Amino acid sequence: MAIEHADVLRAAHLARVGLGEDEATGYVDDLSRILEMVDQLQAVDTQGIAPLAHPLDATQRLRPDEVTEHNQRERFQACAPVTEGGLYLVPRVVE
């Protein structure tokens, strides 16, 4: 799949990214090379190869799932300017 100059400008417009004509030309080349690499990857025969969840066959050592911090809600809410019913009241941002 070939990327054209108009495709780059349209993508920039949709992403709300300011992009000059000279910058777009550079991105056309870069994106075309990226898509060529993707095409090469898709051409590889992966039949019979199990999918990987992670490229390394290592297990992660996890710490025990123990409570290390206790509930301090009342202490933290005492510092807040306004609370009600255990909730923090904040100024309205969206009308």
UniProtKB/Swiss-Prot annotation:
Sorted UniProt keywords: ATP-binding, Ligase, Nucleotide-binding, Protein biosynthesis
GO molecular function: asparaginyl-tRNA synthase (glutamine-hydrolyzing) activity; ATP binding; glutaminyl-tRNA synthase (glutamine-hydrolyzing) activity
Gene3D superfamilies, sorted: Glu-tRNAGln amidotransferase C subunit, N-terminal domain (1.10.20.60)
Catalytically driven reaction(s): L-glutamyl-tRNA(Gln) + L-glutamine + ATP + H2O = L-glutaminyl-tRNA(Gln) + L-glutamate + ADP + phosphate + H(+); L-aspartyl-tRNA(Asn) + L-glutamine + ATP + H2O = L-asparaginyl-tRNA(Asn) + L-glutamate + ADP + phosphate + 2 H(+)
GO biological process per UniProt: glutaminyl-tRNAGln biosynthesis via transamidation; regulation of translational fidelity; translation
Family designation: Belongs to the GatC family.
Name the record gives this protein: Aspartyl/glutamyl-tRNA(Asn/Gln) amidotransferase subunit C
